[in-house]
Amino acid sequence: MLHICYKCRLSKRKLVYTPDTEGAGLVDINLQLPVPISLVDTVNSHGWVNLAPWNWDSDQLELSRPECIDGRTIFTVTVNQSTLTNIDIRIAGQAVDDLLTDRVLCLVKRWISMDWNPSDAINIARKMDVRVAQLIADGGGRFLRSSTFYEDLVKTICTVNTNWNSTKRMVKLLVEEIGNGAFPTPLMIADCGEAALRQRCKLGFRSPVLMNATTELLSEHVISDSGDLRPGGISYQELLSIRGVGPYSASHVAMLEHDFSHIPVDSEVSKYCEEKYLLKPDQVAGFFESWGDYRFLGYKLSRILDQRNWIGG
């Protein structure tokens, strides 16, 4: 058994590689966090955890999913948490090496928004609602993100003008039919064609929207072949410029990129705000305007604290 210790500015990780006779192995990593981050709160923040290929064991409080990295065989990545300042990661698969573990670390950091600095949000919340400030300081206020920007975009497109069960079915079929058990890359989507998205994945009118977005983002080098966003990010206005992406989708994807200045208002959000605040849909953004760049956090975290559920949660 090989024990290797790595150190970096924000984290320490201990890797243990245990091969078996068939070349499979396990790598265990302990990732130390720069600030408290609650895995449970992040998982329960919105409905993403209910979409393939995520798996959440609510008894063991373990989050896992299959990943296909750089065209290799599929690996399973599992995370759990013993304290708010560390995450335990396990990688299971064949030929696990340092390059793979480095990539998995990047994925897990993205899932839990480890690199997001909550200081400004906490400062605003202290003026607006001290409960929200405390929630963020205690490790809440993060929203489960997919392994890539592209996956978050695709899943958001699958929520448009449909019900939650239909969204879950579409995403499940994308994983099974196109991704061979993992979430498909942009190249896999582009290669499968619009007809496959309609017939095999039941995406309906979303099929040309997804094909157009995929080819546009790839050709303009906004995303990599694996779906990672270019350095520098993407703005709300740039998201709106993608044909077929409207204000709701742009707001939701921007939120997952830590732009909390817009509230993705759909029928479910509209219903909640009408019941809670007597607001019409076009009044929601203005009602939370005093939160400035953190409008969405003002809305969503207040709602979480009121013990109301996000759609699909």
Task: Describe each PLM feature range.
Residues L2-G313:
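HhH-family (HhH-GPD) DNA N-glycosylase catalytic core used in base-excision repair
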